[in-house]
Amino acid sequence: MLAYWFLFALFALPALTERMRHPDDPRPQRLLAIFGVVMALMIGLRFHVGADFEAYELIFRRAAEIDLARSLQRGDPGYQFVNWAVGQLGGAMWQVNLICAAIFVWGLIRLCRAEPSPMLAALVAIPYLVVVVAMGYTRQAVAIGFIMAGIASLSRGGSVIRFALYVAAAALFHRTAVLVLPVAIFAGRRNH
C-alpha cells in the first residue's frame, strides 16, 4: 500500500506548486517525464497484481510457443504481437507488462501536457486510471494510452485522420477502442 501512496505523493507535491511557476519554466515538463518513468516502472514491474494476471500469463506462454501468424489469430493482434516478440526473445511476462505500461504512460503524459496543470491532471489519474485500470487490465490500459495520445493530438489541432490512426492502434490491443471514433465528430467544435 505504501508504494501507491508514494506514487500519489510524487505527483501531489509538485501539483501543489504548479500554478506558482512561470509558464516557460521547463522544469515541470522534465519532472513530469521523470515521474512518468517511475509510474511506468511501478505499473510494468507489478507481480500478480490485477484481475487478469493469470490469464495474461497464459496468453504469454501460449504466444511464445507458436509462430507469429497463429499467435495473431488468437486475439487482439497488438497485444499478441508484443507477447510473441517478447517470448521469441526469451523474455518474461514482466517485460510485456513493462512495454504495455510504457505505452499507457506515454499516452497519459501526452494528454496531461495538453492540460493547463499537467501534474494535477496526472495526479487525478492515479487513484483509478493508473492503480485500477493500468495495473489491472493491461490490454485496456494500452488502448486507453493510445486514445489519450489521440485526444492530446486533437487538442493541439491535430487532424481527425491522425486521431483515427491512434484509435486504430488502440484497437490492435482492445477492439472496443473503435467505440471512441465518434469523438472525432466533435473534435472541430469548441464551446465558447
Model-found features: residue ranges?
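Terminal, non-globular segments
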Residues: 1-192
